[in-house]
Amino acid sequence: MSLFPSLPLLLLSMVAASYSETVTCEDAQKTCPAVIACSSPGINGFPGKDGRDGTKGEKGEPGQGLRGLQGPPGKLGPPGNPGPSGSPGPKGQKGDPGKSPDGDSSLAASERKALQTEMARIKKWLTFSLGKQVGNKFFLTNGEIMTFEKVKALCVKFQASVATPRNAAENGAIRNLIKEEAFLGITDEKTEGQFVDLTGNRLTYTNWNEGEPNNAGSDEDCVLLLKNGQWNDVPCSTSHLAVCEFPI
């Protein structure tokens, strides 16, 4: 049997195999549907080389790292404003009455009584030697002669006021106390002719001498108690006996 008659057929098979690698199955069917049939897909090749780095992406959110150690305490800050007062608490229960030794109580009462007795004796001595008492007033003089302003200062120093009779009994007590003319706590310095006491109250009792007050020297703003018990207006700058009154 000769090989030559099959040679054309072998060449045709090689050409068909080579052509099938360069065309798709669909194209081959279109060109030669009756001669060549499509073969199965070939084996995958090796992976290609890595491509170039892409563009830099946007910054991501910070990740949750490990919690660090607790730091040292900071400096003490300034004190805050005081808060509002709290509501009052409930009322407590009534306590038991206190007890004091009977000896201390009786001793205090005894000392108080002795002191009161001594004060009463001193008051009598003062009344007998230097002063006069009428009702709840005690009139006292130190025998000094001075201006009206100094008399006021002297009486205030001893928590008293310049003697101011409110009735005939007080006026007579002051008259019996003095041996010479004395200032009274009465003036018309603010309003001429309107005599008031040192607190600004108008007088409810007067005992002016005949023809007084007359403001003879145009500056007679103070009042004297004369030896006869009557009153006379005089300048406050003159000097006369100081008499103070003490409430008791």
UniProtKB/Swiss-Prot annotation:
SUPFAM superfamilies: C-type lectin-like, Triple coiled coil domain of C-type lectins
Region (Disordered): 43-113
Compartment annotation: Secreted
Entry GO MF terms: calcium-dependent protein binding; D-mannose binding; identical protein binding; signaling receptor binding
Lineage of origin: Eukaryota, Metazoa, Chordata, Craniata, Vertebrata
UniProt-listed PANTHER family: MANNOSE-BINDING PROTEIN C, PULMONARY SURFACTANT-ASSOCIATED PROTEIN A
Domain of life: Eukaryota
Biased composition (Basic and acidic residues): 49-61, 93-102
PROSITE patterns, A to Z: C_TYPE_LECTIN_1, C_TYPE_LECTIN_2
Ranges of residues in domain Collagen-like: 42-99
Protein name: Mannose-binding protein C
Location of the C-type lectin domain: 134-245
Protein task: Calcium-dependent lectin involved in innate immune defense. Binds mannose, fucose and N-acetylglucosamine on different microorganisms and activates the lectin complement pathway. Binds to late apoptotic cells, as well as to apoptotic blebs and to necrotic cells, but not to early apoptotic cells, facilitating their uptake by macrophages.
Keywords: Calcium, Coiled coil, Collagen, Complement activation lectin pathway, Complement pathway, Disulfide bond, Hydroxylation, Immunity, Innate immunity, Lectin, Mannose-binding, Repeat, Secreted, Signal
Domain notes: The coiled-coil domain mediates trimerization.
